[in-house]
């Protein structure tokens, strides 16, 4: 039943097991020209007048009247705003209008990080989408920062290991490179076990070492004692399956 609702972790796993494309329900949205649709034009005018925060508030007030073309147009103005609108309107895991809900920003940086650390762009985008919804200036309650949501201590540790200078942790290139380097470190720690690496990215490797030692990855996921981490792993894996299809 859980696998049949058209999106989410169980849907992605069952589709992959059957050799079916996870993103088969994705609908491609194409703007017919470069002009902004009516509602998007109003938001854009407010934004360009120098009131980006008011523009964001106005966008959410008008979300019911927005079409997919409006949201796609706004993605050219602010990726973070567009994906928040898309996930609010269609749901976090919805494959409808995937060009908006599953964007691929910072392609050059992601490709470089992928080549440097041997991690697929699909996985990098999957983590980034869950961590920050592509908000460059995101800050969590715990103090994690940027696109890949790195704590200062973690960022400094990885920077020393990799010889990366941290001028600004909110800088996309710095944040992505450090986040991918840390993910590589965790994957190596767990001998390539993606599920435990993702759990460690969220909850820390020390905690994960104390959890279920089963080799059954699905049993491990379902027995993760922290609900936030359990849901985090499922969402990142779902994102990963979707991006793997979209990037083919």
Where are these regions (language model features)?
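Alpha-helix N-cap/N′ positions at the starts of helices
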Residues: 34-41, 50, 105, 178
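Short, solvent-exposed, mixed-charge loop/turn linkers that connect secondary-structure elements
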Residues: 20-25
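Alpha-helix initiation/capping motif
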Residues: 30-32, 37-41, 67, 168, ...
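Catalytic glycan-binding domains that act on GlcNAc-containing polysaccharides
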Residues: 2, 7-18, 54, 59-248
């Amino acid at each position: 039943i859980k696998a049949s609702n058209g999106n989410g972790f169980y849907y992605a796993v069952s589709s992959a097991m059957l050799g079916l494309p996870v993103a088969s329900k994705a609908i491609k949205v194409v703007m017919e020209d470069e002009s902004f649709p009516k509602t998007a034009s109003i938001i854009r005018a407010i934004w360009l007048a120098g009131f980006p925060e008011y523009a964001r508030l106005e966008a959410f007030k008008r979300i019911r009247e927005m079409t997919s073309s409006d949201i796609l147009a706004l993605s050219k103005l602010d990726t973070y705003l567009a994906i928040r609108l898309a996930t609010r309107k269609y749901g976090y895991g919805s494959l409808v209008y995937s060009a908006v809900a599953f964007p691929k920003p910072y392609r050059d940086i992601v490709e470089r990080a992928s080549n440097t650390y041997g991690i697929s762009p699909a996985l990098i985008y999957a983590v980034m989408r869950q961590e920050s919804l592509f908000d460059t200036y995101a800050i969590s309650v715990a103090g994690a920062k940027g696109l890949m949501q790195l704590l200062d201590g973690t960022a400094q540790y990885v920077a020393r290991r990799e010889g990366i200078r941290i001028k600004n942790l909110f800088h996309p290139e710095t944040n992505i490179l450090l986040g991918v380097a840390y993910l590589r470190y965790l994957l190596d720690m767990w001998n390539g076990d993606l599920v435990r690496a993702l759990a460690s990215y969220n909850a820390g490797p020390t905690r994960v070492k104390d959890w279920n030692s089963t080799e059954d990855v699905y049993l491990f996921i379902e027995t993760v004692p922290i609900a936030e981490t359990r849901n985090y792993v499922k969402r990142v894996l779902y994102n990963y399956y979707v991006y793997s299809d979209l990037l083919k």
